[in-house]
Amino acid sequence: MAALTLLSSRLRLCASAYRSGGAWSQGCAGYFSTSTRRHTKFYTDAVEAVKDIPNGATVLVGGFGLCGIPENLIGALLKTGVKELTAVSNNAGVDNFGLGLLLQSKQIKRMISSYVGENAEFERQYLAGELEVELTPQGTLAERIRAGGAGVPAFYTSTGYGTLVQEGGSPIKYNKDGSIAIASKPREVREFNGQHFILEEAIRGDFALVKAWKADQAGNVTFRKSARNFNLPMCKAAETTVVEVEEIVDIGSFAPEDIHIPKIYVHRLVKGEKYEKRIERLSVRKEEDVKTRSGKLGDNVRERIIKRAALEFEDGMYANLGIGIPLLASNFISPNMTVHLQSENGILGLGPYPLQNEVDADLINAGKETVTVLPGASYFSSDESFAMIRGGHVNLTMLGAMQVSKYGDLANWMIPGKLVKGMGGAMDLVSSAKTKVVVTMEHSAKGNAHKIMEKCTLPLTGKQCVNRIITEKAVFDVDSKKGLTLIELWEGLTVDDIKKSTGCDFAVSPKLIPMQQVTT
C-alpha cells in the first residue's frame, strides 16, 4: 500500500511538472523515459513548423475537398518554396485554394489521390504531361495510409480487381502528344474463399500535414464533425506529423475517452493564424421547403428515374448514394421507413441540406455539399468508413454510370485522354459481394450512343458488380452469368423500342410489368 501511495504521489508531481512546462523530476525519471522525442513540440509560426521539409519529400495532406484541410500549413509551403513534392491527398482542393495553390505554383511533382474532381488546373496539368498522378480508389488510399501507420507493409483487397488498378496500364504521366509516358504497374492477385483480391502496398510519408479542431498542451488531438476524414489515419503514417489546430487547451480539458489522436502520433503542433474554411458547394434549404413531388409522375426523364430508384429503399437499410439522381431519390423515402444514409467521407446518418443559419464548413457529404445529420448519427475517419463499405456492412449502393455491360461490368470514372475525374470511392462501393449495386442513368448517351452494351469500352470501375439498372425507359436485373433480364418497361414503350436503344441482347421476364414509380 505504501508503494502505491508513493507511486500516486510521484505521478501527480510528474503531471504537475508537465502542465507547467517544467522538466521531469528525477523521481519521474525512475518510472518514465526521459526521451524528449516523445514530447510534442509547439510552434507559433506555421512556416517554422514546416521549413525543414526538403525538396522531393512525400507529404500526406489531410482533408476531403476543402473540409478539414490544413490551410495554414499549405500556405507555409507556398512561402518556403519547397519543390518536387509527392503529395498524398484524397484530392487537390480547387484551383485557387487548398492544394490547388501548390499545383499552381508547380511545387508538386506527383499526386497520389482518388479524385481530380472539379480542379481544372489539376486535370489540365495531368493531361498535358506536367504532373504525375497515381489515381487510387479512395478506400484503398485510406487503407494504404492506415496500414502505413500500423506497420503493415501490404494487404489484399477486392477493390479494383478486373480494372486498370489490377491490370496496370493506367496513365500516371502523359507525354506532350497524349501518349503514356509512365503507366501503373499490375498488382499481384490471389484468391480467398472463391473471391479475387489484389495486393496493395502501404503508404508512409516523410511528413503529414493534418488539420484538427483542438489539441491539449500534452499534444492530444480532437477533430470536429466530418473534418476528420483522411486527417486521422494520416496522423499516424508519417515520420514527422505536423498538426494545425484552431485552439490549444489545458491538459485535462479532454476526457481521455474523447481523445481522437493520442499525443504519441503528434510531433509538432501549431495554432492556425486564421481560417477561411471555404465551402466548395453551398447547399441550403428554406424553412418552407418540402420534398419536391409536384408535377405529373414521370413528366421528365430525370424525375422518372428518381421516382423508380426510390423504390429500392427498404426499412432499416444502410445505403450509400452517389451524387445526382441517387441522392435525390432519398427525398422520396417514405416517412414510415428508416433508411440510414452513409457518406464515405465519414458520416452515418445523413440528414437534409441545412437552413442558411445551420451551414457548417466542417459538415459536408461526399459530394462536398453542406448537409445536416439526423439524431443518432455518427462521425468517423475515412479508413473506418471504407471498412464499413468494403466489409459489406452497407446494404445498398446506388450510383451513376457511363457504361454498363451485359454481365454487370461498370465504367464511370474516366475517358482516356479526355475526361479524368478519378474513381473516388466508386471502386470500393461496388467491391463487396454483400452489397446490392444499383445503377441509375439515362438509357443512351448523346447521339443515342449505347450505354448498356455487350462489353464496356471505357476503363472499368468494377467487374460483374451491378445487380440492377434503372433508366427512364426500363429496369433490368443483371446476372453475372446469364446477363440482362428486362423486368419493367415505361408505359408507351415496347420491348422492340428497348432492343433498338440497348447495345446487347437481353431476356424478357415472363412477369414483365409497367415501370413502377413511388407514390406521392
Curated annotation (Swiss-Prot):
One annotated Gene Ontology cellular component of this protein: mitochondrion
Pfam families noted in UniProt: CoA_trans
Annotated phenotype, changing C235S: Similar specific activity to wild-type
Keywords in alphabetical order: Lipid metabolism, Mitochondrion, Phosphoprotein, Transferase, Transit peptide
Domain of life according to the entry: Eukaryota
Complex and partners: Homodimer. Only one subunit is competent to transfer the CoA moiety to the acceptor carboxylate (3-oxo acid).
Protein name stated in the entry: Succinyl-CoA:3-ketoacid coenzyme A transferase 1, mitochondrial
